[in-house]
Each structure stands twice: as C-alpha cells, then as structure tokens.
Amino acid sequence: MVKVRIRSPAWYDGVDNTPHRSYLRAIGFTDEDFTKPLVGVLAAWSELGPCNYHTLELAKYVKEGIKEAGGVGLIAPTIVVNDGINMGTPGMRYSLISRDLIADTIEAQFNAHGIDAWVGIGGCDKTQPGIMMAMVRLDLPAVYMYGGTAEAGWLGERELTIEDTFETVGSYLAGKITLEELKRIEELSFPTYGTCQGLFTANTMAILSEALGLALLGSASPPATSARRKAYAVASGRAVLKAAELGITPRKVVTYDAIYNAAVTLFATAGSTNAILHLLAIAYEAGVKFTLDDFDEISRRVPVIAALRPAGPYAMQDLDRIGGAPRILKKLYKAGLLRPEALTVEGETIGKLLERWQPPSVPEDGILYSVEKPYKPYSGIRILRGNLAPDGAVMKIGAADKLKFEGKAKVYNGEAEAFKAVAAGEIKPGDVVVIRYEGPKGAPGMPEMLKVTAAIVGAGLGEAVALVTDGRFSGATRGIMVGHVAPEAAVGGPIALVENGDRIAIDGETGRITLQIPQEELERRRKNWTPPPPKYSGGLLAKYAALVQQADKGAVTAIPLR
C-alpha cells in the first residue's frame, strides 16, 4: 500500500489536531483513512455550459483510482467561465481572468487543507491552463485529466462543430442563408456535453497536456461521452499516487524541454493562438525562461501535419479514431522534433512512452500527414514583430490561405463597434480592421474576437480582409487575423496611434507587421495621445487590470513580474 503523506500529518495527526479529524469523521473518515495519503480531486464543474457539465461524475471515477492505489480522495470544485457563451458580450472580459483565478482558488483550497497530492479535471478553455499553472505553482504530485470533447454534429453528410454556428451568423447577416437554415445549424452543431469539437483552445490545451507530460498518454482525445474517459479517470487516480511514490512533482516535469515539446506540438497541429499565452504562463509558474523568441525560433522549423478544424476539415473525434495525440507526438518524435528526455507524470520520459506506443491499425484518412510531406509546409502560428507590435503579436497562419496582406486601416475602439460595422456591411475587401483597447489591461481581460472574425468569414471576406487587435482570438478563428499585439493600446502601444486610412502590411512568411507611416508622424501622434481612464474603479476587473502583465509575458497576474 502506498503511504506518501507529504503534508497531511501536520493537519490531521496528533492530539492537537483532534478537532481537525472530527470534521472529516463527519463525512465518513475512519481511523484507517487518517493513515492514508489525502488526495484532492479538483473538478472544474459547472452547469453553466456543456464543457464542464460532466466533470463531477468523472471526479468520482478518479476517487476510485485513488482508493485502489491506497489513498483517500476528496473532491473540491473551482470556477468555470464558458468562453463560447460569453463571446461578444461583457462576460468575455472574465474569460482570461478566470484562468488565473482558477490557479488561485486551487492554491487556496489545497494549501489550506494539507492535501498531499491531487488530480485536476478540466474542460473549457481556461480551466485547463489554470489547473496546469496551479500544478507547477504548488509542486505537489499531480496529474492533469481532460474532461473530453463533445461529439460533432451532422447535417446530412456535413460534419458540424460550434465553429459553424458562429460563421453562419455572418452568412445570415450577409443574406447568404435563411433564418431557418441558421436555426438548423444552431440545433445540430453541439449534440452532447463536452468541449468545442475542433482543434480550438480546449482541445489544443488537452493535446498539449500530453506533450507537456502532465497527463496520461492518450487521455486527451476520447470524447466526453466515451467509456474510455471514465477509464482514464480511474487510471489518473492511480497514477497520481504512483507519481507521489516516485517523488515526481510538476516542476520536475515542466522543464524547458517540456515547454519546447508543447510548442512543437502546437505549431504542428495549427492549434489555438491562446496556447501561446497559456504556455508562457505555465512556464512563468514553473520558473522556466521561455519567451516569444523561443516560440518564433521553433515555429520556423515545424510544418503543420494535422488537418483539424479550423485549419482543416476534421474534428477531435476523428483524431481519436486514429489514435489521438500519441499518433501526432510519435510522428514528431520519429522526425527528431521532440526532446525525448523530458520526464512525464507517468514516471518515464516522453521518448520511452512513445517508443512503446503503437498506433491502431486504421488509416489516417487525411487527418494526419507526415513531417516530410506535411498538410502545410509552414507552422500553424507565426510570431510577428514590427513597429506596430514591438513586443510581438501572433498570427494563426495555419488557418489562413494567404500569408501576406496589405491594406488600409479601419479603426474601432472595441469589439462591439467593429461587429456593428461588419453587420452593416461597412467592411470592404482590402480593409485592415483594427480593434484596440481590448488588451489585458484595456478591456480589461483581453477578450476573444470570434464574433467579429466569424462574421467576417461568414460574409465571405475571410481572405479579403485582415484583422489586427490587442485582444485575443478564439481557437475557432480562421482567416488573416493578428492578435496579442504588444504593447496594447491602453498602455500606449503603437496600436493606439493608428488612424483610419493608415496602410498596414502583414507578412506571415517573414514575421513582420508594419504601420506604414513615417517615424516622425508616429512620434507626433504619441505626444498627443493620452491614456484612457480605467473602465472599472472596483471589483475583480479593476484588480485584474492593476495586476495583469502584457500578452508577450503570458498576461499573468503578478507582483512583481519575475
């Protein structure tokens, strides 16, 4: 029997802790239970949306695995903000904020109660990095487990994901489909609980949890409705006590090499640009120096090998059918693109796990490609720099057919203004839509622009218009879109100085973004610029705006920034 009681004796052993034991006896603890490791089961659970609807049930299966391995599991919740439901509303300001809040709530709960080890179950976009940040912050034995993707919907022979609902709004506004057709997409696109079905932010972070070594190999792809999801829950409960017995903690796993492997995997799958922010934040919590320069260098050597939405036509359940994330990782490993000595929570290096893993005997069906003959010859994401983004920006080139664009700026001080312009037909081919004051401090919360980007694509302007913002993009975004512009407008970044009619050049091949005005004119505008007053004087959003760092630092909340 495993007996790894790292911290709990200080809470529950001895005469002086008699009252503490009394509390737990009230929920069924026995004398024997107090001799076992106390293992937290963190469930990011909520009925406010489908993504985390089932995680409480999965937590009970995790407890079974913990019990089998000789521990006692205790379930604790954390908050969930459903990104999709909040898209284009004031609620989206709470999305990125929730990532750091989740990490904070886990720290508070588990440090306050003397937990020896824990398993974190995530679902919707920010629950996953929030849990992983807490894993390395607490540095207790821990395993991450994904709640799983929703099943794709079907309209005849057409496979649907939630991406279709956002884009068909644009099609409807452009007069391309009827209201009845839009309603049909609404009804069919999201048929089960689980997360958004394409390689959007949730599924991106799930795959990266395997690449980082924080989750069991193969655990990312089974749908939320699959019986294998419950089996992985039990296995994760057993695995965390094995990790404790071996002395493996997240900071031994999340090294530079692990972040490197995650970055390679992100670029090879054309995953969500949000993952750049989240990997920077996880690296920060782990004390690992990893910057946009590292991402830039890696991105120039890794092609896209996965045809997953929005870069391709397939959903996460299609990837699961051919072996899931391990099939991607093994291709990258065999091509020499991964650092195989990175340790995992399973107690072995990722290289050893991948050597042993064998893919199922099913064809890849155009879902995956080889590194030698990739789906796209370039990376899924490019880091951009230039006089419009001195500290960097990101462009999801894997989901765009054009890598270069030049046009005249149409400037909007917020997403709502921009969406009204798209809906009114004011955006024309050749425009560069600039949405500013939507950064970490300015919004605050760096909201996603999916409502606008999807409306642009749905209107048939996806390759005829570019969008530049100091905000973020949903993982479902496609087209010529540049986000995370740093410094943001609210702190006086050059994006605050752009005027209607200015020409902007975007080059996804070389990684440059240029505001084509003389430097003297830029300086003249800078002298005339005044910072806007804070949007909030109290409450959570005001606290966040005061603490949050810029996008190139992962938008972490920190005093001081290490």
Curated annotation (Swiss-Prot):
SUPFAM superfamilies: IlvD/EDD N-terminal domain-like, LeuD/IlvD-like. Mg(2+) binds at D83, D125, K126, E448. It is an enzyme of class 4 (lyase). Gene3D superfamilies: IlvD/EDD C-terminal domain-like (3.50.30.80). GO terms for molecular function: 2 iron, 2 sulfur cluster binding; dihydroxy-acid dehydratase activity; magnesium ion binding. The active site is at S474 (proton acceptor). Binds 1 [2Fe-2S] cluster per subunit. This cluster acts as a Lewis acid cofactor. The keyword Transmembrane does not apply. Keywords: 2Fe-2S, Amino-acid biosynthesis, Branched-chain amino acid biosynthesis, Iron, Iron-sulfur, Lyase, Magnesium, Metal-binding. InterPro entries: DHAD_IlvD/Edd, Dihydro-acid_dehy_C, DihydroxyA_deHydtase, DiOHA_6PGluconate_deHydtase_CS, ILV_EDD_C, ILV_EDD_N, IlvD/EDD_N. Coiled coil: none annotated. Belongs to the IlvD/Edd family. NCBIfam families: ilvD, PRK00911.1. Functions in the biosynthesis of branched-chain amino acids. Catalyzes the dehydration of (2R,3R)-2,3-dihydroxy-3-methylpentanoate (2,3-dihydroxy-3-methylvalerate) into 2-oxo-3-methylpentanoate (2-oxo-3-methylvalerate) and of (2R)-2,3-dihydroxy-3-methylbutanoate (2,3-dihydroxyisovalerate) into 2-oxo-3-methylbutanoate (2-oxoisovalerate), the penultimate precursor to L-isoleucine and L-valine, respectively. This is Dihydroxy-acid dehydratase. It comes from Pyrobaculum islandicum (strain DSM 4184 / JCM 9189 / GEO3). The lineage of its organism: Archaea, Thermoproteota, Thermoprotei, Thermoproteales, Thermoproteaceae. The gene is ilvD.
